[in-house]
Amino acid sequence: MLANLKIRTGMFWVLSLFSLTLLFSTASAWWAAVGSDQQITELDQTAHQSDRLNNALLMAIRSSANVSSGFIEQLGGHDESAGKRMALSVELNNKSQTLVDEFVENAREPALRVLATELQATFAEYAKAVAGQREATRQRSLEQYFKVNSDAGNAMGRLQTLRQQLVTTLSERGQQIMLESDRRLARAQLLSLCLLGMTVVLAVLCWAFIAQRVLHPLREAGGHFRRIASGDLSVPVQGQGNNEIGQLFHELQRMQQSQRDTLGQINNCARQLDAAASALNAVTEESANNLRQQGQELEQAATAVTEMTTAVEEVARNAITTSQTTSESNQLAAQSRRQVSENIDGTEAMTREIQTSSAHLQQLVGQVRDIGKVLEVIRSVSEQTNLLALNAAIEAARAGEAGRGFAVVADEVRTLAYRTQQSTQEIEQMIGSVQAGTEAAVASMQASTNRAQSTLDVTLASGQVLEGIYSAIGEINERNLVIASAAEEQAQVAREVDRNLLNIRELSNHSAAGAQQTSEASKALSGLVGEMTALVGRFKV
């Protein structure tokens, strides 16, 4: 069955199996990539949830702290500053409420959903307590302020507890996602090993098929071709089936038999040609006229050779002139190659300097970010100092006249904390501007690096082209020298041919007597040669 299998059919099945394996490998890789993308997206959402939670609580604390600062400033008679504090507290409260709502909306797991709902309810209580603080501040009611401040503290404690639980839940979910990713990776590795094994098996089967059904018959056919080319037709060609290889052997068998028949006919013609050649020696007298005509043509040929000698000498002179011009072009090409090499070195140095500057700017961006982190810590410390000053002022107010001096000191501390907070915000704005400018400079330096690299690539390509031109001009110069030398040799040969033609003309006159007998024998020989030509024409070269 395999002996009659078509080669194209076998190759079709081989390619089909490889295509199916490749398709299955691609599909499995696509499936793994989609799963990994989903896990990465879920992990990113988990990180965003943690950020929303922390930012919401931070803004809630800052909202309450601004109310406390506003209350102290209002007690001190700074109504305008207290109003700004109240407005900032409302803004921070709204932002934190938005973050909490987004956290609840994106909490999809049941356990996380329950904690998120509880967080939303507790945050509503805290927001209500902070609103009560703002109302007590507007009414200048110290008693009411202390009452709602206690409620806010209790609510904040519950919020901190819920935050810790939510952070733990989110962390566990992240670890679960990583475990699922590890399991997916293990499955992908096992599948890759299986596909590799299938590919190796298919490759071995394909090689066995090709070696047995294609290479071995082709080697055998090559042996037949070598024997036929050397004239050995004694080994018969055997068939190999009905496929393409079998058809090749059938045609080879036909060619062998055809050559045998042709060789037999050529042998018969050769015997007849031998008899005609024996009579040719006695009938050369008729060639005398042809020899006389040959003498005249030799005279014309001698004249033509003389003219050819003059033309060849002119070619030699032109070749020498061209060689000189090519040498000048070669010098110009060498100068251009040196200039391109210098340009390449300068462009490479400029690219390295731009890359070094880009690295320094990247370091500057990192240092600016570190300064921003330090400013965040300073701002947090100033807020805590403000709260401590507020508590100190409250305690001084309770102490009456005995705590007045302490109240003045607490007010000064609060003022310093407030100024520190404002200065920190201004520095953060300046740091943001510096960071934006630095990142723009980094992008510009990267663009310059890319343009410099493009220029370097173009210059390198130009250098390669000039190198090719330089090599081509050198080769042209060498060939021109060869042409000039060959033309000179041809001129000498032409002069020698002229002398030989004169000698041949003399010899042809002496051969006229024997040429007459050659004519009749040539007629018989022409018929035999025509028959042999027809037989040989059966072979296609």
UniProtKB/Swiss-Prot annotation:
Region (Disordered): 322-341
Domain Methyl-accepting transducer: 269-505
Induction of synthesis: Expression is induced by beta-ketoadipate, via the transcriptional activator PcaR.
Chief place of localization: membrane
Cellular component, GO, one term: plasma membrane
Other facts: It could not be ruled out that downstream intermediates are sensed by the chemoreceptor rather than the hydroaromatic compounds themselves.
Similarity comment text for this entry: Belongs to the methyl-accepting chemotaxis (MCP) protein family.
Name under which the protein is recorded: Methyl-accepting chemotaxis protein PcaY
